[in-house]
Amino acid sequence: MGRARDAILDALENLTAEELKKFKLKLLSVPLREGYGRIPRGALLSMDALDLTDKLVSFYLETYGAELTANVLRDMGLQEMAGQLQAATHQGSGAAPAGIQAPPQSAAKPGLHFIDQHRAALIARVTNVEWLLDALYGKVLTDEQYQAVRAEPTNPSKMRKLFSFTPAWNWTCKDLLLQALRESQSYLVEDLERS
């Protein structure tokens, strides 16, 4: 069993019967990422913690299933439990800040961030560089860095210039770039996660 699946099961087994019922009801209305469907209501309401964990993992896969579970727990006011779930999911891989999804463990090389691991593919395939720059401006990029990247003539050269600043970045900075990529080019990120 994967770490994320175990963490989801652990969280759901620690809910009272009333909290589990509330969790399932919230799961029916929580906003989902594009491309994901809802677990059918009839099947969902009759499930225990173990069945629900299996259904979450089969419907949403481990990484997004854990993120979705943490979001629902947070909506229920169970911030501590949501934090524990995220910590257990990201343990040993350099925890991502709340709301930022880390790359799947199966695709990650020890010690390498998703951004570093897929550097060449990102340089070649990112098309919406301006959007990334706007998302990172003031948080990660200085005005001088922002202008230097924008001055490059092509998208690949802009991405190369952007990557020239990453050796000075910490995990949080790289997570912000990953989050911006997820928002602007989610299909590219999903494709790289599967590779």
Curated annotation (Swiss-Prot):
Limits of the CARD domain: 107-195
Effect of residue 13 to A: Abolishes interaction with PYDC1
Result when mutating residue 67 to A: Abolishes homooligomerization
Main location group: cytoplasm
Effect listed in the UniProt record for changing residue 23 to A: Abolishes homooligomerization
Stated consequence of mutating residue 25 to A/E/G/K/N/Q: Abolishes homooligomerization
Domain Pyrin residue range list: 1-91
Effect of residue 40 to A: Abolishes homooligomerization
Record note on what altering residue 12 to A does: Abolishes homooligomerization
PTM annotation, UniProt: Phosphorylated.
Induction behaviour: In macrophages, up-regulated by endocannabinoid anandamide/AEA.
Tissue expression as described in the entry: Widely expressed at low levels. Detected in peripheral blood leukocytes, lung, small intestine, spleen, thymus, colon and at lower levels in placenta, liver and kidney. Very low expression in skeletal muscle, heart and brain. Expressed in lung epithelial cells (at protein level). Detected in the leukemia cell lines HL-60 and U-937, but not in Jurkat T-cell lymphoma and Daudi Burkitt's lymphoma. Detected in the melanoma cell line WM35, but not in WM793. Not detected in HeLa cervical carcinoma cells and MOLT-4 lymphocytic leukemia cells.
Modification Phosphoserine occurs at: 195
Impact when changing residue 52 to A: Abolishes homooligomerization
Gene3D superfamilies: Death Domain, Fas
GO cellular component terms, A-Z: AIM2 inflammasome complex; azurophil granule lumen; canonical inflammasome complex; cytoplasm; cytosol; endoplasmic reticulum; extracellular region; Golgi membrane
Keywords in alphabetical order: Apoptosis, Cytoplasm, Endoplasmic reticulum, Golgi apparatus, Immunity, Inflammasome, Inflammatory response, Innate immunity, Isopeptide bond, Membrane, Mitochondrion, Nucleus, Phosphoprotein, Tumor suppressor, Ubl conjugation
Top-level lineage group: Eukaryota
Additional information: In breast tumorigenesis, methylation-mediated silencing may affect genes and proteins that act as positive mediators of cell death.
Complex formation: Self-associates; enforced oligomerization induces apoptosis, NF-kappa-B regulation and interleukin-1 beta secretion. Homooligomers can form disk-like particles of approximately 12 nm diameter and approximately 1 nm height. Next to isoform 1, also isoform 2 and isoform 3 may be involved in oligomerization leading to functional regulation. Component of several inflammasomes containing one pattern recognition receptor/sensor, such as NLRP1, NLRP2, NLRP3, NLRP6, NLRC4, AIM2, MEFV or NOD2, and probably NLRC4, NLRP12 or IFI16.
Task performed by this protein: Functions as a key mediator in apoptosis and inflammation. Promotes caspase-mediated apoptosis involving predominantly caspase-8 and also caspase-9 in a probable cell type-specific manner. Involved in activation of the mitochondrial apoptotic pathway, promotes caspase-8-dependent proteolytic maturation of BID independently of FADD in certain cell types and also mediates mitochondrial translocation of BAX and activates BAX-dependent apoptosis coupled to activation of caspase-9, -2 and -3.
Record protein name field: Apoptosis-associated speck-like protein containing a CARD
